[in-house]
Amino acid sequence: MTTIKAPSRWSGTRNARPQQLAGHGSVSPTAPRAILVRMDINARNIATTAADAPTTQAAPAPVVGRFAPSPSGRMHLGNVFSCLCAWLSARSQGGSIVLRIEDLDDRCKRPELAAQLIDDLAWLGLEWDEGPYYQHDRLDLYENALHRLQDAGLTYPCFCTRAELHAASAPHASDGTPIYRGACRNLSAKEIARRSALRAPATRLRVPTVDDLADDVIEFVDRTYGAQCEALATECGDFLVRRSDGVFAYQLAVVVDDAAMGITEIVRGCDLLGSTPRQIYLQHLLGLPTPHYAHIPLLMSPDGRRLSKRDRDLDLGELRARFGTPEALLGWLAGQTDIAPDTTPRSAEQLVEHFSWDVIRAHRENITITAE
């Protein structure tokens, strides 16, 4: 069983800049079995061989967090809470923040929404140190990573329709994604050619088979929710790395970007907790470092709904008009979520001294919030 636990301090260096992913070497065809090996995630770097590795221990690298919003609509209060926690965590540790706009999906390719998002972050006083970087400018990096996986025989074309994947009888993973049962895993070359003539396939990544059930568990320690584990074969299945329309899957793109940008700490909503084992698996296959993960509770409306851009719940247009100043909004939000002892207006900088992961851990459950 592989144990991949996030350490409290990081000794990696930020060798790869956002324009270039370090280590374009090949992936071993036996890589799925390599996940059975206990790894020192502080030392992994596919650009450095063991013989060339330095003998002296590097000083701990500074914390590098990130904002990674999608411009699919105006930011809502839940997005603000996530960005605020990421910013406060990094700043409280003397770290920096990278801004990345995740706009691969067609519905996110709206420059006016990206510009509004950037303006909202600046208005809130959540300053970033690098970026913004746009995923639509980084397709060559994702293509390179996918080719490495394909060359190692770790992927295969999948022709399953959405209706087939979402069949009522199909089991689903913790994040609602159908657990793929491998219908296209072992198609012959002739059958692949026949189906390809009818429709474009998606691309799936192989995970260790159920025969390796005792050994395919991905384990990590989340800063909020503690020890987590997932058996890839039974709780996830082979997962997409590229959609049938050619768009790179979220799991692959964020893994490539987080490594290239030197991200050491990922703070995001607990709805993405279930994605983490897949991302750690990809990091291992590609020889990339594993960041420290911290998932936070979601903000919920009084009727039990998760706040969403689609429903325009407490979006920043409404919130900016209502509160007038970023200090008033952030102070109110910090008081509502117990980051601060009360709702006194405070700037993001003033909230740094109040921030503690102990408070976030104390919540664990999602937080019901209103604009009253």
Predicted features along the sequence, with ranges:
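Short secondary-structure transition/capping segments
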Residues: D137-A152, S174-G182, A202, R206-D212, ...
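Cationic, low-complexity basic patches in intrinsically disordered or flexible, solvent-exposed regions
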Residues: Q20-L21
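Non-catalytic terminal extensions that flank enzyme cores
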Residues: S26-G73, S92, I97, A193-R194, ...
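A general structural signal for well-ordered secondary-structure junctions
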Residues: E127, T155-Y156, S174-D175, K190, ...
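N-terminal Rossmann-like or analogous alpha/beta NTP/dinucleotide-binding catalytic cores
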Residues: D40-A173, C270-D271, S275-L288, R346
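Active-site cores that bind ATP or allylic diphosphates and position pyrophosphate for catalysis
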Residues: A163-S308, D315-R320, A371-E372
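Short, mixed-charge aromatic SLiMs
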Residues: D105-A115, S301-R305, E353-R361
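Low-acidity, Ser/Thr- and Arg-rich intrinsically disordered low-complexity segments
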Residues: M1-R17, S26-S28, R33
